[in-house]
């Protein structure tokens, strides 16, 4: 590939060991690219005019310059451009264009020869992008402009007919749906992988007794497996939310809505909807181009998932601290300190906790962007992609990192048990013991509270009281009190559905796996 060096800057200073020198073009420039493959000249510039701007580079003409008689200020071009963030939709843009052109041919709106030329040209663009022969021009206004003008340079007038019966308004509404559909399916797969990793750890630790907490105070005995499975259920709901959002996204196809009022061409919108994997075309053309509910809904699901990852991360941060020491993280997923040699920092989980606010910001951006704009399409809506794509990328990165970290995490059951032995987490079981012997629960609660207070003053646990000392508080106490307040018995005695017994944890694992079709 050859690049016109009039459009190039200097090599990056940070490319120390890199064998390849990158020379980025100046802003506003277009690559002059020649193929190494079947096409001698990818861009035939005789097919359209090329404008030279005052930054030292060339600009393609905008697709929308119909009534304009004056060149747009280069600063407006830079401000208006979306190529840096919508370029990721190029495969979806090409796919949508192939289906749209096929429909135009089917309806007799363009000739079959034009359809064949368009498809051949679009496929060649896709092939050259994949092989690296072609790069996306960073100075094109947007991905739609780049594709159409590259196509026209390759196939001539047939490329100019591609946009018949279509607006960029319905085109971008389609592209982002197709892109987010793929992104959602990928994220769903990652969430499933994380859930299975949690299930594996929970199965191994289904009998490890630890304190359960409320208000970050030791409360009642649970097992580590039970605690982990709480997050599996949260993530299962996240999976469901993404599936629901994707199903609604796939319900309606916006292609054919035009700018807002449909078109006079005899389009077959049901054909394009079916070919693109949608249930039906959208029922209202204005809604078709102005709807971004699907971005908001998917980002909301991602924000909720990030909230759950953040809660899990916070627990991991606590658990691996010396104050808890319930787990040990693998060295590969921790960092050190530049000054304190003893440090082993859980940076992964801290970053996840921090990045959660970033995704919340993405959701807020979408909501605020959409709340006040009139129908139909407004340029404000260009801001949707940066927000939703950032949320996708952030969640994808967090899931990709936390899953292997959890897979290599090592529980420390002895430390969990030592923590459980302190804090009177069996006090509720003591009160339940008296209640089952006939004492009203509120009286049993008060009696046990008095005992706990006395034990704290005497620096004892409930298990360390003699039977005579128990009887000083109630004659209902018998020798079986010691079994009743044994921590393992406390866990195994909580046989209510969804509880912490080992059998319950194993059933939860089986239920969760069945729900994700494993």
Predicted feature locations:
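Short, charge-rich patches within N-terminal targeting peptides
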Residues: 12-20
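Short, Lys/Arg-enriched N-terminal segments with co-localized hydrophobic residues
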Residues: 40-59
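Methionine residue identity
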Residues: 1-2
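Glycine-rich cofactor/substrate-binding loops
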Residues: 59-96, 157-158, 340-518
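A helix-coil-helix interface module used to build multimeric assemblies
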Residues: 58-248, 252-253, 258, 262, ...
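Acidic, glycine-rich loop-and-beta core segments that form the ion-binding/anion-interacting portion
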Residues: 280-364, 368
